[in-house]
Amino acid sequence: MLTNHHVIAGADTPGSKVQVTLNDGSRRSAQFVASDVNTDVGVLKIDDANDLPVMQFGNSDELRVGQEVVAVGSPLGLSATVTSGIVSALNRPVRASQGGGESSLMDGIQTDAAINPGNSGGPLVDRSGNLIGMNSAIASPVSYTHLTLPTKA
C-alpha cells in the first residue's frame, strides 16, 4: 500500500505494525516496509491482502492542464470522501514540512480538487479511475491550492 511518509512517520521502523482502515470500514494489520522523507512516499504491506482490489496506474506524464481529476481521502476522519476538480498546473515544486525540517518534492501536480488534512496518502485519479498521483500537500494559507505527487516522476 502506498501512502505518504508523513502519514506513517511514527511507525517508520522496519517491521513496525500499524492498523489501516479500508474504504468499507474494515481494519487490517499492516507492516511498515519503507519510506523516504525526501519524496514523502511510504510503503506498507497489508496482511491478508489477497482479496483487496488493486488500482491501475495511469501515466501522469500524459496529464494536461484543465483535465478533470478526483481526489479520494479521509479528511477530518470522514472516510471515503471524494472531491473533484481539474489539473490547475503541472511540474510545481512542492515543499512539505517533514519532522521539523523541509524536503523538496519536485514536479507536483497542482489541482483545485479539495485536499484537506486527512487526504494525505490518498489517490488522485483520472476520469477512468486510474491512479495519477498521491495527495500530499496543501499550500496554506492559499485556499484551493493543493499539490499531488505524480505517479511517474
Where are these regions (language model features)?
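Serine-dependent protease modules
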Residues: 1-147
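A short, hydrophobic C-terminal helix/tail in secreted or cell-surface proteins
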Residues: 148-153
